[in-house]
A protein has these predicted regions:
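RNA substrate-binding interface of SAM-dependent RNA methyltransferases
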Residues: 72-165
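Structured adenosyl-cofactor binding patch, chiefly the S-adenosyl-L-methionine
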Residues: 200-226
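Short amphipathic alpha-helix with an adjacent loop that forms part of the alpha/beta core around
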Residues: 153-159, 176-183
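Short, ordered loop/turn segments at secondary-structure junctions
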Residues: 12, 70, 112-115, 219
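N-terminal positively charged helical leader segments and presequences
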Residues: 1-73, 123
Length: 226
């Protein structure tokens, strides 16, 4: 049995309505996946749960899916942010894809003293996040923030949201202990540094903030995207 393709759409989803395919979605379904009129597709929009639909109209560059019935109700997902230093194209694409698959709700790229790239194509990252959500089965697509300097992000940090700093110096408690002590507070964030690590002044600045908790991931030095 052929597995059903999942597509993210922005339309409201309810039984009986028809959803217009974008040109890109049409190309993917018809020319890449070889779907035909009458084939079933799964749709989600991050608000109304997951729905089963059927290809009702297929034209040269457009098409429509009629919504049949709901497969899953929308449920509250973990609200975990990932604050990470900007990376080059390949690594930042990898981070976006894997963080989306793991359920991160928002990705916040930041510019640090040792950041080796300050340019990013946000539209490309949003597409990667959307495709990862479609593939992995989650019901939402994570948000992606405009890159800002680390200090800007932290100076406007939302009240009540904790930040777990992955400290490559090994000064913090093991991350397993930190997360156990916090009983995983929904509404936290994790902060990852750049290649070469945070500068000493950046570490000192962050550790003096009341909402920051340092955590160690062990003695091994990992790649920034890992």
């Amino acid at each position: 049995m052929t597995s059903l393709i999942r597509l993210y759409v922005t339309d409201k989803l309810t039984s009986g309505i028809e959803v217009e395919l974008t040109e890109k979605q049409h190309h993917y379904l018809v020319h890449v996946m070889r779907r035909e009129l009458g084939d079933e597709i799964v749709l989600f929009n991050g608000r109304d749960g997951e729905w089963r639909g059927k290809l009702k109209i297929l034209l040269k560059k457009s098409g429509r899916i009629i919504i049949l019935d709901q497969l899953r109700e929308q449920k509250l997902e973990a609200d975990l942010w990932l604050v990470f230093a900007m990376l080059k194209r390949g690594p930042i694409d990898f981070v976006t894809e894997k963080a989306s698959e793991l359920g991160v709700s928002k990705l916040c790229p930041v510019i640090t003293g040792r950041t080796n790239s300050t340019k990013v194509n946000l539209d490309r990252l949003k597409t990667i996040a959307m495709e990862a959500a479609e593939q992995c089965g989650r019901l939402t697509v994570p948000g992606i923030c405009e890159p800002q300097r680390l200090e800007q992000v932290l100076s406007n940090w939302p009240e009540g949201r904790g930040l777990v700093l992955l400290d490559e110096s090994g000064a913090g408690k093991p991350i397993a202990e930190v997360m156990a002590d916090r009983s995983y507070r929904n509404g936290d964030a994790i902060c990852i540094g750049p290649e070469g690590g945070f500068e000493s002044t950046e570490l000192e600045y962050m550790k003096n903030l009341s909402f920051v908790t340092s955590a160690s991931i062990g003695r091994r030095l990992l790649r920034a995207e890992t």
